[in-house]
């Protein structure tokens, strides 16, 4: 149910140009390839080795979905992108590759001609929705696969060859959305290979700026196939230097930080003064990958802030329990807020954003037209005077702090426009590196996207300035575990539909695609 505050408030219109930043220009993708020590992948028509284990690996990687026990279906499956020669090299009985959308690149072949190569008429008819012909190269396929028709139904896109398509994968613009390379390394090298795929060695940088990092590699194994070829499964990912900023800071805090007591009684290791920068261009979303971040919670909370809400029950009813501890009867009473109903947080973030300076009575009292609407004022400046240096939103109101369940940690954001791009600098006074900061990074990235939609700008950069950056003592070991993980490329944000007003966006309107994080690392919240 919508709150009375949300229904009555004067809303912020979404700009007519908002649709231009609703999705990335190209669909992110991964490469799957088997190559020998010299980069050989075949002779242009056949694969010069028989490794049944590689075939099983290929099927598993390109077919399996990320959710536990989730089976592919037309409403959610992966896509495999291949050249015409690769399609023709598939045994007819295996065309199309099952449980995947088969995207075939050809300058001449039509979908009907591709389907005609399937001998079984029943299977040919069934394959009509499983094959797409694209008249062009990999870039054209990725542009098609990021369209509204495919964004939600395709989980991961895999480029599976041949040689020309692989080369396109490592060149701009496609390389800019490369997420991973799954490689089967075959030994010894085959003398019959005439087609090669040169993958840059880990740690080296290509002219396009690609630097690959090895995430994993198996021990060398011997195939049961003819010839007993040796093989290894290797996964390479583009280096994510932006997430490395976060990991390096966490490591430095653990190793060099000052041991301090704190309000919660848990204790911290702390450093003072740090900064991280994250690009938001082309809808890249800085959602950390070295552990799963609760995106739905990030999105629901930010939209709750944006509407000026202060009733934590609105979040709790949606399964978002991040404010339950601070909204509990016991916690409110400990703050002297005995007149508040349970889950009334007082004049916290959203109230300050939309009603700064107004008197706060309770979360049930409408404050429409009272105080300063900082968000609306910033949007007005972004449109009318984008060079303004006063586009600041602050949640830190000293006069209202005693009435807040919790003083704001992320307390001030300044917006900046350059060359049609909107950037945001966040100042955070208290920075819980284990739990809070990953959440805050994604939250202010989303805020920047939404402010760009309201002002007709493109998202630029998020600059995160940290004051007291700390790791709680009971988070040290979980953080050490996280530091051992190789960060993967960030995902992308898609707005499935635009709204007339900024406050009308729902979590269901916003989707994160190609998010492939490591599993959750449990950390207890200090209250």
UniProtKB/Swiss-Prot annotation:
A biological-process GO annotation: dTTP biosynthetic process
Key words of the record: Methyltransferase, Multifunctional enzyme, NADP, Nucleotide biosynthesis, One-carbon metabolism, Oxidoreductase, Transferase
Any one Gene Ontology molecular-function term assigned to this protein's record: thymidylate synthase activity
Domain of life: Eukaryota
GO cellular component, one term: mitochondrion
Keyword flag Transferase: yes
Alphabetized Pfam families for the sequence: DHFR_1 (PF00186), Thymidylat_synt (PF00303)
Pathway: Pyrimidine metabolism; dTTP biosynthesis; Cofactor biosynthesis; tetrahydrofolate biosynthesis; 5,6,7,8-tetrahydrofolate from 7,8-dihydrofolate: step 1/1
InterPro entries registered for this protein in UniProt: DHFR-like_dom_sf, DHFR-TS, DHFR_CS, DHFR_dom, Thymidate_synth/dCMP_Mease, Thymidate_synth/dCMP_Mease_dom, Thymidate_synth/dCMP_Mease_sf, Thymidylate_synthase
Residues that coordinate or bind dUMP: 263, 410, 428-432, 440, 470-472
Catalytic site: 409
Swiss-Prot/TrEMBL catalytic activity: dUMP + (6R)-5,10-methylene-5,6,7,8-tetrahydrofolate = 7,8-dihydrofolate + dTMP; (6S)-5,6,7,8-tetrahydrofolate + NADP(+) = 7,8-dihydrofolate + NADPH + H(+)
Annotated positions binding NADP(+): 34, 40-46, 84-86, 105-108, 161-168
Residue intervals of the DHFR domain: 28-238
Region (Thymidylate synthase): 243-527
E.C. designation(s): 1.5.1.3, 2.1.1.45
Matching NCBIfam families: PRK01827.1-3, thym_sym
Self-association and partners: Homodimer.
Family statement: In the N-terminal section; belongs to the dihydrofolate reductase family. In the C-terminal section; belongs to the thymidylate synthase family.
Reported function: Bifunctional enzyme. Involved in de novo dTMP biosynthesis. Key enzyme in folate metabolism. Catalyzes an essential reaction for de novo glycine and purine synthesis, DNA precursor synthesis, and for the conversion of dUMP to dTMP.
Name of protein: Bifunctional dihydrofolate reductase-thymidylate synthase
